[in-house]
Amino acid sequence: MVMNNKKKLVILGGGVGSMAAAWQLTSQPNWQDIYDSITVYQMGWRLGGKGASGRGDHARIQEHGLHIWLGFYDNAFDVMQNAYPMLDRPPGSPLATWTDAFKKHSYIVIAQNYNGKWYPWSFDFPENSSVPGYGAITPTLWQYILRLIDFFIKHFRDTGMKLYVERAIESDEHQSAIARLNHFVETKLAGLEIGAKTLAQNLLLVIETYVKNLSERASGPTEDDHQQIIWLLKELHASIERHLKEKINFDLEIYRFVVVMDLAVTIAIGLLRDRVLFRPDKLDSLDQEDFREWLARHEAFDETVSCDLLRGFYDLVFAYHNGDTDRPSFAAGTAIRCLFRILFSYKGAIFWKMQAGMGDTVFAPLYLALKKRGVGFKFFHRVQRLGLSADKKSIKTICIARQATVNGEEYDPFVRVNDLDCWPATPNYCQLQEGQALQDQNIDLESFYTTWKDVEEITLQSETDFDDVVFGISLASVPYLCRELLTDPKWQAMANKVETTRTMAFQV
């Protein structure tokens, strides 16, 4: 008798985390030597989690929010670049390749409230020849700071010079700043000729030269170097404040320039002043403080801390306690890491726009590719709770409610729209024994609050039905589905302290 030592793996939930896990596990050349089966249990009729989409009346795309991918999503694009060829779609057919499904999008507009009126604040980010998913090398924190400094120097030269006008009769403080800069050049950059330019022009040249010299040094910058950079940046910041700050409430262009410069310069000053590069946990060391509070601590202007640019950034990740916009909460280190990745690590374009719903462009291809690899899918299976073993060290049982009965052996989840496999906005009722009742009662099988009576409860047993478990359901479900795990202090801390935000979407 041949013993089968292969394991059974169950994946709970069909969102992006679960699909990424299924893809990675089945990307190993010998995965079928390890696992006898991999099965995904998903409530309702489709995959996607928050990224799900469906085709409603007249095949209109319905989804929870407008989804885009950022240009630094190397892992996600790598998956798509490998999944799409497995679909064998004919050339010229809808979404035949990943480049058909994702297009560069570089023009971004934020609504800005300025002096009681709304204005579009537009950004047209330059594109580059890099391809997301290839050559994924993340810059070091020091390299990011260098890119940040390079950015605001270029921004000042391109935008600020026409706005920055030094007064004909300068203040004593201005003259003192010139003297301090001349002394710095004499002692730190001997031989550099700064000439008869404005103070701002000279400051930009000195910062650029000093930082370039540091970047070429094999040993990297010292703490003293950081202090010198801080001094230079504070001189630049003070010059902007002297000559432009008082004008921001009367000139929209000046307001925008000052806010962008203040934000960039303050981030650089704050990172160096907090000695983040010398801390073992780097940016994580700042995560006990809200990003806006961190900026204020490092003397950013009030107008910058409250600007619509930051509001849009917080909105992007729903960074508010319980969704309350009066209680912003974005961990400073995480926020800075996000900004750096978004602005200085993108490939091709800052955003890539899906050419259909996220379900059509991401989760339908993943479903089809994973099925080809041998992954099983059980739709209409809602996880109810996980039970632990007697020693509390492993999962013993998984209780699952079957929501509906499929006619035949397997549920076909798609509808065809212009020769493209798409998820419908409601189940394919004709494939379900309870389909008519679900339709008549307008039941939403994806709702946490559904009143629908489940068909039956199934209990999966470890070592019989599964050996390994991937829990891919939203973190917010843990207190409801994994109560026994919460006796562990680490699980309890995660459930209590890592917040999620409820969101609502609508279409008109």
Predicted stretch roles:
Residues 57-183, 205, 220-246:
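Dinucleotide-binding Rossmann-like beta1-alpha1 core, especially the glycine-rich loop
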Residues 21-36, 369-375:
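A short, Lys/Arg-enriched amphipathic alpha-helix followed by its capping loop at the start of a domain
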Residues 493-508:
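Central beta-strand plus flanking loop segment that forms part of the substrate or channel wall
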Residues 154-457, 461:
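Active-site/ligand-binding neighborhood in enzyme catalytic cores
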Residues 17, 21, 46, 476:
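Conserved Rossmann-like nucleotide-cofactor binding loop
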Residues 10-12, 41, 383, 462-478:
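Short hydrophobic core segments
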Residues 3-17, 39:
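Beta1/beta-strand and adjacent pyrophosphate-binding region of the FAD-binding site
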